[in-house]
Every structure is written in C-alpha cells, then in structure tokens.
From Swiss-Prot:
Protein's name in the database: L-type lectin-domain containing receptor kinase VII.1
Molecular-function GO terms, alphabetical: ATP binding; carbohydrate binding; protein serine kinase activity; protein serine/threonine kinase activity
Organism (species): Arabidopsis thaliana (Mouse-ear cress)
Assigned EC number: 2.7.11.1
UniProt entry keywords in alphabetical sequence: ATP-binding, Cell membrane, Glycoprotein, Kinase, Lectin, Membrane, Nucleotide-binding, Receptor, Serine/threonine-protein kinase, Signal, Transferase, Transmembrane, Transmembrane helix
PROSITE patterns for the chain: PROTEIN_KINASE_ATP (PS00107), PROTEIN_KINASE_DOM (PS50011), PROTEIN_KINASE_ST (PS00108)
Chief localisation class: membrane
Superkingdom field: Eukaryota
C-alpha cells in the first residue's frame, strides 16, 4: 500500500510526458505526413514553399498534431524554443511582397484569413478580436498605415492582431550592443530566426543563416500568453501575396518545449541561394537606349548652357544700359548686396512677410543688426519687375511725406537681382487689421479707422499736388497701406506709379491696378488720372468702414451695397459689426456716417462728380476757409456756403425732401462736414 502511494505521488510531481515535444526538419519530404499544407503551400525539392507567383493568395503549413501549450495542473504557459531558416525569394522584374508569420493557432485551415497586408493571418473583420487566440511573429516587407507598421522591413510580435505589440527594423545587434546592422528581408538571402519563450518573456533573434547567433535579441519583451493560447495549439507558418508577389520558403525548422538547444542540430550551410543574379550592364536590353539617351542629353545640355550664357550676357548688357541713367540721377543710396543678403539670412523663407506680383518681401536687419527694414526682391526674369524697380526708384526715391513709406536704398546685383529697401512697418498692412482673425490683433475702433483714412488721404494729396511733379499711384488698396509702430498709415508699393508734370496730359493706355478698385473709365480707356486714384480711395474708405472687401463671392459689390443702404436710409447698417462693438463708437457715429458718404462720393462712376483729394483732405480738416478758397466755380461756392452753416442731421438732409438722394446732395453733404476734432494740417508733406 505504501509503495502504491509513493508511485502515485511521484506521478503527480513529475512533468506530464505528453507535455514534452521535440521535432526537427532539415528539409521536408514530399510525402511527409508531419506537416499539413493549406492554400497554395507546397513542398518542392525538400523546401516548404508557402507562396509562389500567384497574386492575392495565402499559403499555410502547420505541424500535423497539436502541441500542449499549458501545464495540465497549473495551467501556466509552457516554455518553448523554435528556430527556422526562411527566405523571401523575389521574382525578376516583379515588386516583392508581403511577408511571413510564425504562429500558434487554435485550428487548422485558412478560413478567417485574407491575403496581401493581412499576411494570411487575419481578415478585415476579425483583426484585433481576442477570441482569435493567435500568437505570431511577423516578418513584414510592407508598411501598412492601418496597422501602424514602423517601416517596410520589420519584425513584430502579434497577439490576436496585426497591430504588433512590439516591433523593430529587421537586423541584429553587435555583441557589445552598440552597433545595429539591418537585414533586408526580401533580398533572397537565407535567414535563421530563434524564438524563445519562458518566464513570461519573448525573445526574437535573427541572423544570416550559417552565422553565429547574436547574443542580444532583436526583440525582447514581457508577455503573458495565458489568455492568448489555449491548452493545445497548432504551430507553423503562414504567408501571403497581394499585387506584390514573392516566394516565401522554409528550409529548416526545429521546435521544442523542453530542449532549448535543439536548434543547434539544424543544418545552416550548403543551402540553396535565392538571390537574383545581376545582369551584365552591357548585355542589358536597355543599355544601348540609355547610352544614346545620355549622349543626346549631354549634347542638349551643352547647347542649352551655351544659349543661356549668350542670352544672359545680352540681357545683362541690355539691363546695364537701361539702368545707367537713373543710377546716376536719383539720390537713394545703393546698399551692398552682401549686407542685404546677410541681413535677411540669405533670403530665408522664414523671413518672408509678403508676396507681390513681381517678387517677395523679406524682413531684415541692416547696420549691424540695429535697423529693421523690409526688402522687396523683384524677380529678375520679369520685364514688369524691371519697370516696377525703375518706377519705385524714380518716384518713391525722392518723395518725402509722413504718410508715405520711406525708401532707404536699393541694390542691383550684376546678375540681375533687384532689391528695394524700405523702413520696416511693425504693424503690417491695413487689410490684416480689418480682415484677419488673429488673437494678437485687436479690432480697430471707429476713431482709429477714420484717423487712418485721413492719413492716407494726406499722402495721396501730396502725390497729386504737393511734389514738384504729379504722381499717380494707380494701386491704392488696403494691402498697400502699411501701419508703423504708432499706427500711422503709410502708403506703399509704387510699382505701378507714374510721374507727370502738373500741366502735362496723362498718356497711360494700359489697364493696371487691382480688381474692385479700378475706376470705370480705366477699364474702358486704360487712362489713369488723379480722379482714378480718388475712386480707389473711395473704395478703400468703404472697405475700411464696412469691414468688407470690394468684391466678395456671392455678394453684391461693396459700393452698390452701401449705395442701396443709403437709399433706404440704413447707411449705418453698413458699418463693420466688429467696429460697432468697440468702445466709444457712439461718440463718433455721425462722423462715421459722413465718412461713408464721402467714400460713396469719391467712388462715383462719373469722374467729373468726384471731389479732388484736396477737397477730401479739407473735409477731414474741417477748415471752411480753405474749402472756400479752394473752389472758384460759382455753383460750388453757393452749395458750400449753404451747407457749412448747417449742423442738422445728415439723415434729415438725405431724406427730408425726396425718397432717393441725388449725387449733388451727396456731394453737398459730404464736402460740408466739419470734423473739428481733427485740426492738424496735412496739406504739406513731412
């Protein structure tokens, strides 16, 4: 009885013999009954071939008996060690894909799996399902974003999902752990892999077949497989192709859950090679074609270089001749190119603060990093850019007014790169303050907007009457009004400007400017005048006060919209809603209404009915004597005298006698406004 009890106790404490399994394949027999094949998997010449050139196909091979993976008493996962030699053999002139997986599966067959990026392991619906009970190590040669693959040549540990729990680029570490040497999975070479699992740690190591196993694993991670594997599982390999194809092959395989040195018995040398041979360049069919093409390209390149050199020299000579006159005549000093290049950090794109039709504008520092400037670099390939450069030098170079951007200097590089250097305007362009939603920008108040419009009017008056010659700006718009540190407006961009004698007729016939700001007569005849500048200024007034661009998709043109509001007695509804929420707007609401009326008058379609810029400035100044002296026409004097004494509501004037105002009424009311709080003289430039 004691002997029987002893034998029973011994049986319970000793490992169950059915839990131990060892097998080794140094090649596979065609008639082997130890491996079950599924899909397109075959055994050829003692090599287990999982896939071939068939597109969108799956091949799977499993050991034909289940393997106990859990201890029958403790239910803990049994350790195991497996090693195999595989190759991904590419086909000539075919892109290779997709990959191979060593796996534990609860059942045989390939049902529930898809080809291509799913590697014959899962499909679109069951990927990531805990009920899969699949553990695998993938060798993947395609980076699938949906699975968060790290690259197109990686090894990953998969648990019920193709989203690897741990992955790394395929390769191995040097024994000192300092140098990582990548291995290309699908280059046709034979690779040996070692996968060990014990004490809840998975180690994956790989190396070129025939070489010593690296000391440091490629992958090593803690992993509890208790909820993943079942008591008994099938073990083997699966691979798949898609539009990309290659042959996934297993040349040798060992597995044990008791002997971790069994892999030493694998034959790793003398194995067939599947690396594609390299064709001789001379024998290649495309060699002659490429050689002829190269010769042709060389000849063409030499011809183009010679043509470019000759053309550049002729262009340089032409431009040099063109520039000689004004270079000697105009005072703005020439700044060395090296200083400008250094100040803009080599025209770094990070310093771009604006882009115009003929070039970019960069922020820079001159005079040892002390002076902030804006550098306008005009395209050397543009004839318009050349004309713009000469125009700005010859006009803006000699103009001096507090409401015009100051030109500090210019630069003309020999190769034809033209630059204009201006004072830097810290607060950028006016349209940025009107239209951009920027936390750093506060909404301009009504009083600030009127002050800015007053300054712009002063600058335009100086151009028309205050200088030795008459200057037509021809491109007045919100983006060409810059604001300095003190929010003083400065009119900029004189690239379209033209200079004429005060008594000289204007001979422009070319339509230039910006859509929405062009006066009707410019569109019809191409002729610019001081009145076309007045028209553009009127549109600017409406734009600034209403917070709307001249032309917006799906909306009426700005001028027509404001005119309609005025006819209905609702002109105040046209004011910018953001501006109406600013502090103090009610105190200047009458002035805002009159400025809108002034804008409408300036933008009248009949140039003869528009005021001059002198009249506009005098409206802002409120100097009655100057208004009177500025006009000689008897009818103009009569309406000015009549309206200067009127302090009644403008709405009474507009709508007291008729339902629709006339342009003469607009002219009378607008030009009789007295804004007495604005008393600084702006008729002289300074």
């Amino acid at each position: 009885m004691k002997a029987l009890l002893f034998l029973l106790t011994l049986f319970l404490i000793l490992p169950n013999p059915i839990s131990a399994i060892d097998f080794i394949f140094n090649g596979f027999n065609d008639s082997s009954s130890n491996v079950s094949l599924f899909g397109i998997a075959t055994i050829e010449s003692k090599i287990l071939t999982l896939t071939n050139q068939t597109s969108f196909a799956t091949g799977r091979a499993l050991y034909n008996r289940t393997i106990r993976t859990k201890d029958p008493i403790t239910s803990s996962v049994l350790p195991f060690s497996t090693s195999f030699i595989f190759t991904m053999a590419p086909y000539k002139n075919t892109l290779p894909g997709h990959g191979i997986v060593f796996l534990f599966a609860p059942s045989t067959g390939i049902n529930g799996s898809s080809s291509a990026q799913h590697l014959g392991l899962f499909n679109l619906t069951n990927n990531g399902n805990p009920s899969n009970h699949i553990f695998g190590v993938e060798f993947d040669v395609f980076a699938n974003q949906e699975f968060s693959d790290i690259d197109a040549n990686h090894v990953g540990i998969d648990v019920n999902s193709l989203h690897s729990v741990y992955s790394n680029t395929s390769g191995y570490w040097s024994d000192d752990g300092v140098v990582f040497k990548p291995l290309k999975l699908n280059d046709g070479r034979n690779y040996q892999v070692w996968i060990d699992y014990r004490d809840f740690v998975v180690n994956v190591t790989m190396q070129v077949a025939g070489k010593i196993r690296p000391k440091i694993p490629l992958l090593s991670t803690s992993l509890n497989l208790s909820d993943v594997v079942e008591d008994e599982m099938f073990v083997g390999f699966t691979a798949a192709t898609g539009r990309l194809v290659q042959s996934h092959k297993i040349l040798a395989w060992s597995f044990s859950n008791s002997n971790f040195s069994l892999s030493n018995s694998l034959i790793t040398t003398g194995l067939p090679s599947f690396v594609l041979p390299k064709d001789s360049i001379v024998k290649a069919k495309w060699f002659v074609f490429v050689l002829v093409l190269i010769c042709f390209l060389v000849v063409a390149l030499v011809g183009l270089v010679l043509f470019a050199v000759v053309r550049k020299r002729l262009e340089r000579a032409r431009k040099r001749a063109l520039m000689e006159d004004w270079e000697m005549e105009y005072w703005p000093h020439r700044i060395p190119y090296e200083e400008i290049e250094s100040g803009t950090k080599g025209f770094d794109e990070k310093n771009v603060i604006g882009i115009g039709g003929n070039g970019k504008v960069y922020k820079g520092l001159l005079q040892g990093g002390v002076v902030e400037v804006a550098v306008k670099r005009i395209s050397q390939e543009s004839s318009d850019g050349m004309r713009e450069f000469v125009a700005e030098i010859s006009s803006l170079g000699r103009l001096k007014h507090r409401n015009l951007v100051s030109l500090r200097g210019w630069c003309k590089k020999e190769v034809g790169s033209f630059m204009l250097v201006y004072d830097y305007m810290e607060n950028g362009s006016l349209d940025r303050w009107i239209f951009e939603n920027d936390e750093k920008i506060t909404t301009l108040s009504c009083e600030e907007r009127i002050r800015i419009l007053k300054g712009v009017a002063s600058g335009i008056l100086y151009l028309h009457e205050g200088w030795e010659s008459k200057v037509l700006h021809r491109d007045i718009k919100a983006s060409n009004v810059l604001l300095d540190r003190d929010m003083i407006p400065r009119l900029s961009d004189f690239g379209l400007a033209r200079v004429h004698g005060h008594e000289q007729p204007v001979r422009t016939t070319r339509v230039v400017g910006t859509a929405g700001y062009l006066a009707p007569e410019v569109v019809k005849t191409g002729r610019a005048s001081t009145q076309t500048d007045v028209f553009a200024y009127g549109i600017l007034v409406l734009e600034v006060m209403c917070g709307r661009r001249p032309i917006e998709e799906g909306k009426k043109p700005l001028m027509d919209w404001v005119w309609g509001l005025m006819e209905r007695g609702e002109i105040l509804n046209g004011l910018d809603p953001q501006m109406m929420m600013t502090q103090g707007v009610t105190e200047v609401i009458d002035e805002a209404e009159r400025v809108l009326q002034l804008g409408l008058l300036c933008a009248h379609p009949d140039p003869a009915k528009r005021p001059s810029m002198r009249q506009v400035v005098q409206v802002f100044e409120g100097d009655k004597a100057e208004i009177f002296e500025a006009e000689s026409s008897e009818d103009v004097e009569s309406w000015m005298l009549m309206k200067m004494g009127s302090r009644g509501s403008s709405r009474e004037f507009w709508y007291g006698s008729s339902s629709h105002p006339t342009i003469e009424q607009i002219r009378l009311q607008s030009l009789s406004v007295s804004l007495s709080s604005w008393n600084s003289s702006i008729l002289e430039g300074r």
